C-alpha cells in the first residue's frame, strides 16, 4: 500500500464507495505505483512543508477528484475523517473548491473502521510485533554502560529492516535516567552508566500498520523507590 513520506496524502470516498487517492506533486508516480486504487490525483494542497513553487506543474483540483468518483454537485456535505491531521492549507483548499458545501467532522467513521480489524490487518500487526520483539531482544542483549542512546536505536533500526519491516512503525527512541521522566522523547548522545534505568520504545511497520513495544531495562540492580516506580 501507499503512505506518504514527507508530503501529505488523502483519500476521497463517495457515498457509494468509489475512491481516489490524492497526493502531493512529488508523489505522483510513487502514489500510483504503490496504491491499489485506479485513480490518483496530484493536488498542491498536499505538497511538502518547504512549499516549493512547481512552476511547470498542472495540478488537479478537488473538483477533478470528486468528479472522478461520481460527485458533480456543488452544494454537498463533506465529511473530514480527521480534523486533527488535516492541515489548514488542505482545509482551506476544500472550502475554496466547495464554498456551498457543509463540512462536518467524520472522525467517528475512522474510529469505527479501526475498531474491527480484518484477518489481513491482524496479520500485518502480528508481523510488526514479531519484528519489534526481535529488535527489543537484540537491543537488550547488546546494551551496556558506555553505549550511547543513539547507538542503541541504531541496533534496533538495523534489526527491524533485516527482519522484514518496511519502515520504523513510529520514530524509535531509547532514553535513560533523567529523560525517563518524559512520556516520549528523543534519543541523545548520552552514554549509559551502570545502574541506569533505560526506556526502550521500538517499532516496525508492515504495509502501513505500526507495531510498537515499550520496555524498561535496568543496567544493574533495581532497588528501593526506583524499583517501586518501575514495577
How should these model regions be labeled?
Residues 1-231:
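Active-site neighborhoods and metal-handling regions in enzymes and metal-associated proteins
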